[in-house]
């Protein structure tokens, strides 16, 4: 089923603190390779694999030429050009994107994926203080 095409866009960054979210020392990764991978809901072989490289600001665009309503599609990290920030962590290396017109999303053909990150092997020295500033204690329990 050909259907309308889509443009998947998103950003790749380096997480030098291994925090799992962006901090003030995170930076975008230029020249990173990402792929869109679509698989049937019930598992099985990939139905689509398309790659792109990030620009100078860490953004990528991948054109997809058909509807993938019956599949789960994800943008997945493939390769980092930055050897100091090239670790890929399972489950944190991907962002799901809906590539169908039958889901109520009104943006005509554009799908924005959540940012995805490569990690440093060892966090930067200053990361302890940076993460303390975010005050990541558990929220109080609500009665």
Swiss-Prot record:
Glycosylated residue positions: 24
Got any disulfides in this one, which pairs? 14-85, 17-127, 38-73
Keyword annotations for this protein, in alphabetical order, are: Allergen, Disulfide bond, Glycoprotein, Secreted
Subcellular location, record wording: Secreted
Q: Which domain of life is it from?
A: Eukaryota
Instruction: Tell me a GO cellular component.
Output: extracellular space
| Family membership | Belongs to the Ole e I family.
Q: What is this protein called?
A: Pollen allergen Phl p 11
């Amino acid at each position: 089923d050909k259907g309308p095409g889509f443009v998947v866009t998103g950003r790749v960054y380096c997480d030098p603190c291994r925090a799992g979210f962006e901090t003030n020392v995170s930076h975008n990764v230029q020249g990173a390779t990402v792929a869109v991978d679509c698989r049937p809901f019930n598992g099985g072989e990939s139905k689509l694999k398309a790659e792109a490289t990030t620009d100078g600001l860490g953004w990528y665009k991948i054109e997809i030429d058909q509807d993938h309503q019956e599949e789960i599609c994800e943008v997945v990290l493939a390769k980092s050009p930055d050897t100091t920030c090239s670790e890929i962590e399972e489950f944190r290396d991907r962002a799901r994107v809906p590539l169908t017109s039958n889901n109520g999303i009104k943006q005509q053909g554009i799908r924005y994926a959540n940012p995805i990150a490569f990690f440093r092997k060892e966090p930067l020295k200053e990361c302890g203080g940076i993460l303390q500033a975010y005050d990541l204690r558990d929220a109080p329990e609500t009665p």
